[in-house]
């Protein structure tokens, strides 16, 4: 070597960016040339021989032991290393030091060098040194190095670290040292005894500092200190209290296992039984809160101040005989935050591990909106707004909850590479719902920006400086300048005035308009401004619908239908669907009729006004269709001042609830369809329209002036159906004339007719495909469909509405169109390279158009792989149904899984409520109820309560039924008004009409017993699930009865409370011949139990 200086060698290597592993080879060559008498091999041998003598050396003696002289090679090298680290010119220099010290483990060098680190002034390079060392020890597997490390831990490493005064160093260095200690201490097989009080105090200060910086790391660090360090004759500051105050436990709603104190208590009688009862109470409370929160989200209930008071009253409603401690608001929010994240973890785990046969995600989106926006808003409005409230809540979240949430987000992160990271202890960049929660709180000023780093640094990396610290609503104007919105209503009005309707459906053009820009980034808007925007938009819609400001009404409705960045879903969470539903129902059924008559009596209205009149009706119907089909809003249950007669006379409700049905007869006035004059006029109107559309090739003014959009909404689908069926039987042969006539359906005033067409096509194309139809006929049908799905040109007023109509029923249509592809084996060739685009060009064009309509903004309950179009080979068959039954996942298995969940007293249902609702509707509520009751009765009677060693007492058996009935009541009832009405109904002894079978059906087969251990927390990870094996016997008779959900009078007939009441009243009638007196007594007991819960539960 030219230079005898290690410093010079290292700096030259760092300048050339030579890796640490290559530097080690150069270092060995330098060492052997510079110190030939102390070569690397000889030195290592001496180290191994002499290391054994250190085992019995006390910690303090090892530190005070003199080191070698100035001419000693070890001392020279240590001095050179200190110069390198002080230099700080290259970060890689710290990597070189770690490589020499630990990778090429040198005990004497470690003992000499580590005590000098406390004098190092360059703290940045010191942080990197500890981080790099930690990364090495985390993955260390070399037994020789581990044995040397264990000897040095006791003698050198731990004492050197604990000499540090942790009160005077930076937060970053505290975390780096803690992680280093955590990594090395895990290797020691026996606890290291510490005699020094200074070391004990410094350890306490380190843990205290860490708890203020990173709560999660602090928990883990305190745990390993408890295990690996023993402070002589001193009570360990990290020992946990063995007596837990169960009543005030911060884990009251956490799935963390709460050990029953029964085995560990010496007083066995009264005290142990009371403790066991408390444990059961906590478990039931956790279960109730889970269903309560899920039901509230499922039913779009408002989150206002009443929500907080109702939540606080849950425990007292469950246990009215217990004395309840009065919680202040901050403690209440601590519990609510912890409960909400726990419930979300259970929700995503159910979806990840139990629901592979569904694609539901609307309820998940509601959970995300609740945790990221609404919960921070509730904290901001109702709590003391102090950061320690949030800190305490996040501290209380169980580690398995965090693991479950992180695992779910990693599973759904398409961009994440799933390889094993060499340094897996390093922070990752994967974000989850906790980040969004804290970001919103930071916007509202509840917590500082550094809060997110302090609490989530353990496994996530976030730049706290980039976080928004105000709730300002901003947008970028056309000059590229960011503006702050101070007056939201004026901002909306000015944006609407400059908005071009044709740009509403173009994602690339939304940035040109302020409102579209804000809605397209709605998830980044602060909760307070989201709330203000939601209320301002609804107020403006209400005002414009009553004053007939149709330009405002049309544009606002059009913007909302596309749901950019989940904006419509968010608005529904803030104002509830009932408000919007009532608004649009009243516009269609009341305001529109009166206003249109007034407009028609006024002469001189412009073409622009005519278009707005027709388009306002069309957009209103489209919005109602979205609310009903995509958001599953039951119009009748909205209580929008509709009596039974009004419901029958409501055009909006009748239209939307019968979307796939196109009648074979058309009448101008459905109410007077028996009137001969109406029949003659209707026949003449249809004949004139057919003649103008398909013979004359143009529509006369008289036809256009004498028909209303309501009539067109029914006439257009009627004509479409009749013409298509006529072509199918060969009654019509001129395809070009038909195409020319269908093109008129794309005019703005006629587009409303396509709504029904899109739903009718689903069943028509299914029949066409299943009938082995001639290919020529299929080509003709596809050509006709191509006219309305992929038009060559569109009016600027038609463009956005046409795109929105395509989105309505695109998923089922895509599923059927895929079946028409010529590549019939594409789905079976899964994993084999094969192009999807082998079908008819017209067919592929329609498929592409439908996919593009879905891709511009969120659509719910669909398989996301449908929207992936850049793959050149089939990876996996897409799912076109949101719920499906397979041979592996049968109805019997699903029902049994849920029944076993009730029996096992899990803290959440096995399936999420959206999945369960479909399961219950498919089986019918009555069949579900009877099957579950029969099976639980059998299990409790013969097997007792799961995981209870002895045969259960009556109280324990009752708890299983209680779990079921709390679910039934919360599933049925949305609010206290419904509960009062149902209670009054069930207390009435007047007979009711009986529909369908009633009575308890005798069980012919006994369900197979299950003894798999299934702790409550295992539900989070799909472990020890209650699934039946493939060879288990069926426990139900598969029946699929049609549910009369659309009938106002029949709605309550499908609640569990109604069914129980119906069965009770049916005793003694002809329909109940199979019901014994014992069965009747049982149903009376269940009736009383349900009624009692109705009166005591919080809704």
UniProtKB/Swiss-Prot annotation:
Q: What does this protein do?
A: Component of the Mediator complex, a coactivator involved in the regulated transcription of nearly all RNA polymerase II-dependent genes. Mediator functions as a bridge to convey information from gene-specific regulatory proteins to the basal RNA polymerase II transcription machinery. Mediator is recruited to promoters by direct interactions with regulatory proteins and serves as a scaffold for the assembly of a functional preinitiation complex with RNA polymerase II and the general transcription factors.
- Region of interest called Disordered, as start-end residue ranges on this chain: 41-66
Location(s), subcellular: Nucleus
Name any Gene Ontology BP term.
positive regulation of transcription initiation by RNA polymerase II
Q: How does it assemble?
A: Component of the Mediator complex.
Q: Which Pfam families match?
A: Med5
GO terms for MF? transcription coregulator activity
Keywords from the UniProt entry:
Activator, Nucleus, Transcription, Transcription regulation
| GO cellular component term, pick one | mediator complex
Q: Which family, according to the similarity comment?
A: Belongs to the Mediator complex subunit 5 family.
Task: State the protein's name.
Answer: Mediator of RNA polymerase II transcription subunit 5
